[in-house]
């Protein structure tokens, strides 16, 4: 690996990994479950990189030995040919491993491990936009199921002709944000609505916002900025229906964000859920501000995740989904059934390549 700065990074990672391994064996850490889990997670995050680095070191030593054998076998054609084949094989494996190591050393998004709030809003297109928003709720729910994630509908505003004016899903599981963060933006659909007698194709949109869940300590909310009212809500049945004010209407004055929660059975639970959604929305605003500062220096080829950015078109006539950031097409029927993994992996790969290009430019 010619890049000295990458070798230096790998040595630093190895030293940190060794120190974390030592700390796990420390009796003082072992008796503190919170600290032990924190150290264990930090160590686990570095393990793949360290193992790949050790494999790279081993392959390089094997390459040195193969070259020495090739040099010493000047008068033995068969042995010399074997050494040449081994040198070519090892060189190829080392080159592949170096590319993998470069990706492993890219800065990690601190939000990648987090659960998310996924907000889907009907956009342009009238009733059809609400129906389309409902289709997206179904698509993401199906994708989450393939990943083994848990999905809960935490807030909804139903559209008159079906679907949603707005829906917020809470999605919990392993590294949810790391994959779904690429879904933020405008999703456009081109199809013939069921109500269209003439068979004319309509274009409608829905906006997706992906918000990592945050703790109270990460986002401060001034109580003076909140207006909170309650209302009666139809529940799951029984005496509480329309008699007890369990619904919560929360308004955040500085941003104009309004959240109406009715999904929980108690007013307290709906209040907690409303504040949870508000924290996620405020954190997403902060993230977007940081993102805009970054993209002013580097325009990501994958896209900024801006809500106003059209990221994808779903064309029913041609059974085609076009991701405009990637310039690639995918099967519409597969995607709508929740097969988003090919698109998401392509976004991750493109993002990594863009970061690698920036890193190389900075080192040049």
From Swiss-Prot:
A single GO molecular function term of this UniProt record: translation release factor activity, codon specific
SMART domains: PCRF (SM00937)
Location relative to the cell: Cytoplasm
UniProt record similarity statement: Belongs to the prokaryotic/mitochondrial release factor family.
Taxonomic lineage from the root: Bacteria, Bacillati, Cyanobacteriota, Cyanophyceae, Acaryochloridales
A GO cellular component entry from the record: cytoplasm
InterPro entries, per database record: PCRF, Pep_chain_release_fac_I, Pep_chain_release_fac_I_sf, Prokaryotic/Mito_RF, RF-1
Modified residues (N5-methylglutamine): 239
Protein name as it appears in the record: Peptide chain release factor 1
Task performed by this protein: Peptide chain release factor 1 directs the termination of translation in response to the peptide chain termination codons UAG and UAA.
PTM annotation, UniProt: Methylated by PrmC. Methylation increases the termination efficiency of RF1.
Gene3D superfamilies xrefs: 3.30.160.20, 3.30.70.1660, 6.10.140.1950
Principal location listed in the UniProt entry: cytoplasm
Keyword Secreted attributed: no
Keyword vocabulary terms for this entry: Cytoplasm, Methylation, Protein biosynthesis
């Amino acid at each position: 690996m010619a890049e000295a700065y990458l070798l230096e990074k790998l040595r630093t990672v190895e030293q940190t990994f060794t120190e974390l391994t030592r700390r796990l064996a420390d009796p003082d850490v072992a008796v503190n479950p919170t600290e032990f889990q924190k150290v264990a997670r930090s160590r686990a995050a570095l393990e793949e990189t360290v193992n790949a680095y050790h494999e790279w070191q081993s392959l390089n030593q094997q390459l040195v030995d193969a070259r020495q054998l090739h040099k010493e076998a000047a008068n033995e054609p068969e042995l010399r040919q074997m050494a040449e084949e081994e040198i070519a094989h090892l060189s190829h494996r080392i080159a592949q491993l170096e590319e993998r190591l470069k990706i492993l050393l890219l800065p990690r998004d601190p939000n990648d491990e987090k659960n998310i709030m996924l907000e889907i809003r009907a956009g342009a297109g009238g009733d059809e936009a609400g129906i389309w928003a409902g289709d997206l709720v179904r698509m993401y729910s199906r994708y989450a199921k393939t990943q083994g994630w848990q999905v809960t509908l935490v807030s909804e505003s139903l559209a008159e002709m079906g679907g949603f004016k707005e829906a917020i899903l809470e999605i919990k599981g392993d590294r949810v944000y790391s994959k779904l963060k690429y879904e933020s933006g405008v999703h456009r659909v081109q199809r013939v609505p069921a109500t269209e007698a003439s068979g004319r194709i309509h274009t409608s949109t829905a906006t997706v916002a992906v918000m990592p869940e945050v703790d109270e300590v990460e986002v401060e909310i001034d109580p003076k900025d909140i207006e909170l009212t309650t209302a009666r809500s139809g529940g799951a049945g029984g005496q509480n229906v329309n008699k007890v004010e369990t619904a919560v209407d929360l308004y955040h004055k500085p941003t104009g964000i309004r959240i109406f929660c009715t999904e929980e059975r108690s007013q307290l639970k709906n209040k907690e859920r409303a504040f949870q959604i508000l924290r996620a929305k405020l954190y997403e605003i902060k993230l977007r501000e940081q993102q805009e500062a970054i993209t002013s220096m580097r325009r990501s080829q994958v896209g900024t995740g801006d809500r106003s950015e059209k990221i994808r078109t779903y064309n029913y006539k041609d059974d085609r989904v076009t991701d405009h950031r990637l310039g690639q097409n995918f099967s519409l029927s597969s995607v709508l059934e929740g097969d988003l993994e090919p698109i998401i992996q392509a976004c991750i790969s493109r993002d990594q390549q863009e970061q690698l290009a920036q890193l190389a430019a900075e080192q040049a």
